[in-house]
Amino acid sequence: MREEQVSDCGSITLEEWNGSSSTKLFKTATITASSSLSIQRSANRFNHVWRRVLQAFVPEGFPGSVTPDYVGFQLWDTLQGLSTYTKMMLSTQALLSAIGVGEKSATVIGATFQWFLRDFTGMLGGILFTFYQGSNLDSNAKMWRLVADLMNDIGMLMDLLSPLFPSAFIVVVCLGSLSRSFTGVASGATRAALTQHFALQDNAADISAKEGSQETMATMMGMSLGMLLARFTSGNPMAIWLSFLSLTVFHMYANYRAVRCLVLNSLNFERSSILLTHFIQTGQVLSPEQVSSMEGVLPLWATSLRSTNSKPLHKRVQLGVRVSSLPRLDMLQLLNGVGASSYKNAKYLLAHIKGNVSVILHKDSKPADVLKSYIHAIVLANLMEKSTSFYSEGEAWIDKHYDELLHKLRSGGWKTERLLSPSITWRANWISHTSAAKFD
């Protein structure tokens, strides 16, 4: 304790705090001024050091600067990353062995060419995957997150299998590289979407940087464990495969738990369908936490294996349909209906085709119109099984309840600015001032 003489101006106590926000502040010293100056510093140095270390791995203002689901997701994501880099050492060891590292007969140019083909295939695969699926990743981030890690596991499996097929080595490793290229695109894109979701204080860059630190730490720990595991299992194929398969099972389990922790408040096809179905039945809106526990996260091909009597409502709606692809009879009915006064200023049209609802969007439709068209289509799909006059009943329901639905969604914490959907490339334009109807 240190004391210095000061002028007598009453008693004043000043506390010194350290931290970047109120959620991380802690007291480091207490200064008392009366007839003398007294400075008492905090004795808890460990707490100070621990907070400094933590600042390298969690966003500034944590936990108040991120959503509540951040901690659970990052915990399971770190565990899956740890298992990934541990088993990566096993697959890399097998790959290097197949290329010929350590063999006298192996040539530098031969190994270089094989590595070139492997990387070239992966780069080409990444471009093709982005071309075909890049615009779909935002709308189903949970599913694509799982798919990304599944494809990574398949890629590592190909590397581990490569020594067993020396005559088809190039084909096997190229398939593995192709699989991992899908991982790079899907994982990076969904990570960007999730970072925006976690950011409560416009701190996406900080969250991304700290996530990079977490991943680097998991990488270093995983590679260290992987080196030990590779050393202990070297020359024992049974132990290698048992270790790899065990780590793969844990990896997928950790990924599943990670995406299950996510509570997204954006509207996509499935979440909108769940919300609307419940609203029609009860007049109430489910919370993001409730919907999160109800929505599916498995890939589409996995959910299609389940035996169901009827398709979910969101799978019976086709958004942004190309008009010329409709059956001629349905197209004629649609064109005749455009002349009705109710459609003159409409921003979308609905067509009922073989139990499904097709949505034709106007070329001037806005994000709010896209959301309304999809909600209207879900209402129509729900009414088709209950009434023969579903078109008129659907119109009446939208006119009466749509604004109420939006208000309750906003009050419940949902984002209603837009519908997260795959890219809509087909739109239409209709003119009904005479008997003419024009479509672009």
Swiss-Prot record:
Its record classes its membrane topology as: Multi-pass membrane protein
**Family in the record:** Belongs to the RUS1 family.
Subcellular locations according to the entry? Membrane
For this protein, the parts annotated as crossing the membrane are 109-129, 154-174, 232-252
Q: Which domain of life is it from?
A: Eukaryota
Does Cell division show up as a keyword for this record? Answer: no
This protein's record includes keyword Transmembrane = yes
- The molecule here is called Protein root UVB sensitive 3
Assigned keywords, A-Z: Membrane, Transmembrane, Transmembrane helix
> An example Gene Ontology cellular component term from the record?
membrane
